Design a protein with these regions (language model features):
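NAD(P)H-binding glycine-rich loop region in Rossmannoid oxidoreductase-like domains
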Residues: 46-103
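Active-site Tyr-X1-5-Lys
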Residues: 147-177
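Mid/C-terminal beta-alpha module of Rossmann-like enzyme folds, strongest
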Residues: 231-283, 317-318, 323-333
């Protein structure tokens, strides 16, 4: 199988490329030239990649030849949300997602042998900030203007809606389209979300964030890859699919289980005002920590998909073990 991954030079692309490449599939990553060059110099994260092809995410070029004849396209392109939401970054987040998605659709539409499935990154952030009930694809409430949610959080939701709308508008009648409403994908890769959270725990700072009631949705890297395989194989599934473990849990419990898995006896909590100051210093937004994302994988479960890591406690132990193992390997290299 040939898998093409536009925007695949980041953490998620690395996770997918390693897994699919190890299975013997041909993995081609499309990346902006600086990203592609950096990834090429870092062999561990980009294991499994047959080749990295340059693209600008804005214009058709030689990269489109890779799409023609591919079996699957997994579009991960988009400016990172881990930044301050000023006017420049807001425009970049919207433009990079909408423009690249439209471009991928154009390449697929022009292909003589289009891929049979287009897996398009979206986000679980599209759902409302809520504590009372989980959001699945059938009954979940899309966010925007809900009580208790800061108005500035609406921006991320509108970005996600524009992303999915662009996918829906793409005229690719010979290619099945799936929007991946993904939760945070946890892997031991350095610089990823798990590595960031674990760094807090290792420094004694991994306590409750805010009041700790906000739900954290997540998925282990192995289940993320397995879910992609399942979606590729099930020709009857299209549209939005929640790619998240079935066990979201409040932040206080989430961090407690992570501390337990690492063996950290304490973790200092962070109030909302402390998080606000930290977000400014780290050039990010508190929404990434304080929004309640209670998302469950309704369609995956209904279709018979089984999770290797359905509960965070087991996933946290496995990820901590993997992080330690990789640290030892790097020291011994």
């Amino acid at each position: 199988m040939k898998l093409v991954i536009p925007g695949g030079t980041g953490q998620i692309g690395s996770v997918v490329a390693r897994a699919f490449g190890k299975e013997g599939h041909e993995v081609v990553v499309l990346g902006r030239t600086p990203d592609a060059a950096r990834a090429a110099r870092t062999p561990r994260p980009m294991q499994g990649v047959a080749r990295i092809v340059a693209w600008d995410g804005a214009t058709l070029g030689e990269w489109a030849r890779e799409v023609d004849g591919a079996d699957v396209v997994l579009n991960l392109a988009g400016r990172s949300v881990n930044c301050r939401y000023g006017p420049t970054n807001r425009a970049a987040m919207v433009d990079s997602r909408v423009r690249s998605t439209r471009l991928v659709g154009e390449a697929i539409a022009r292909a003589a042998r289009p891929p049979r499935v287009w897996l398009q990154a979206s986000t679980a952030t599209i759902y409302a900030h809520r504590y009372d009930a989980p959001n699945d694809e059938a009954t979940g409430i899309l966010g925007g203007g809900e009580p208790g949610s800061p108005e500035k959080w609406d921006f991320s939701i509108e970005v996600a809606k524009a992303w999915e709308r662009t996918l829906a508008e793409a005229a690719t009648p010979r290619t099945r389209k799936v929007a991946l409403r993904s939760a945070m994908t946890m892997s031991p890769d350095r610089g990823g979300i798990f590595d960031t959270l674990l760094a807090l725990v290792r420094r004694g700072l991994g306590g409750t964030s805010g009041d700790g009631r906000q739900y954290v949705s997540w998925i282990h890297e192995r289940d993320f890859v397995r879910a992609l395989h399942w979606l590729i194989e099930h020709d009857d599934v299209d549209g939005a699919v929640n790619v998240a473990a079935p066990g979201p849990l409040p932040n206080a419990e989430f961090m407690r289980e992570l501390r337990k898995a690492w063996g950290a006896p304490i973790g200092l909590p962070a109030s909302e005002w402390m998080l606000a100051i930290g977000a400014v210093l780290m050039r990010t937004e508190t929404e990434l920590i304080l929004k309640s994302r209670r998302v469950v994988p309704g369609r995956l479960l209904a279709g018979g998909f089984t999770f290797e890591f359905g509960e965070w406690s087991a996933a946290a132990r496995d990820l901590c073990d993997a992080w330690r193992r990789e640290s030892r390997e790097r020291r011994g290299a």
